Amino acid sequence: MIGLRRGDVRLFEHNKEWKIEGERTVNELRKILGSDAVDIQHIGSTSIKSIKAKPIIDIAVGTDDFNRILSHEAELLKAGYHYRPNHDMGGAQLLFACGSYYEGGDMQTHFIHVVKYNSMEWRNYINFRDYLNTYPEIAKQYENVKTGLVEKLGSRGSRNDYVDGKAEFISRTLRKAMVWSFLGKTVTMDIDRPLGYVHRKSGYKLVYPLNYGYIPGVLLIQLSRRFISQY
């Protein structure tokens, strides 16, 4: 089964059809967008093996230029992808959606999230999926959070309450997933507090025993409601 009536909060057993439809959608978008999409990935709960999910396919499109994606708007619409300009997350994302709801019905089937490639939005989408697929016990914990919320709220419960109820788990897990994504890799860091740097505050001082810095472009996890809703 693919699709859910807009506003419903219902979970279904994992279905192999979701992976097939995700791959089909990725391939279709690649044909339409060509090199204007740096990468396209199936994300969201339907991309996480074995856990229950809303049967809506989420796709992340990574690009270097939103305008180049928008230049394909007519072709995307012809293929059933409706641009939703009121969901641009302050310029950080473009959203396209599929389903009869956008043509007078009530079903939503796909959400296409266009973000800057290698941005925090992109990293979060990919890291959360890969981390839960690598650690099925954590994926099961997440499923338990979701099923508990559905039991509490009911199938026609507040979607906002459902999204808010997942936020703490997703935020905590994303922090772990971000660190995990760098394990075993060589990274370049900007050092802003070198070895021996002295930090003085309120009567005490701290001398840094090592070089302290950050990975450029990697920020503290700040999640939007749109991101949380995909999982």
Regions found by a protein language model. Give the residues of each.
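Feature detects long, helix-prone N-terminal segments enriched in hydrophobes
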Residues: L174-Y231
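Active-site nucleotide-donor binding segment shared across nucleotidyl transfer reactions
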Residues: L29-L70, G196
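Charge-rich, low-complexity N-terminal segments
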Residues: H14, R24, Q41-I48, K52, ...
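Catalytic cores of NTP-dependent nucleotidyl/adenyl transfer enzymes across multiple folds
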Residues: V114, M120-M178
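Conserved catalytic core of two-metal-ion nucleotidyltransferases
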Residues: Y81-N118
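Short amphipathic alpha-helices in soluble, non-transmembrane regions
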Residues: S71-A79
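Helical scaffold of the NTase/Pol beta-like nucleotidyltransferase catalytic core
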Residues: M1-Q41, S171, R175-V179
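A short, surface-exposed helix-loop junction/capping segment
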Residues: I2-F12, K52-P55, T147, E151-K152
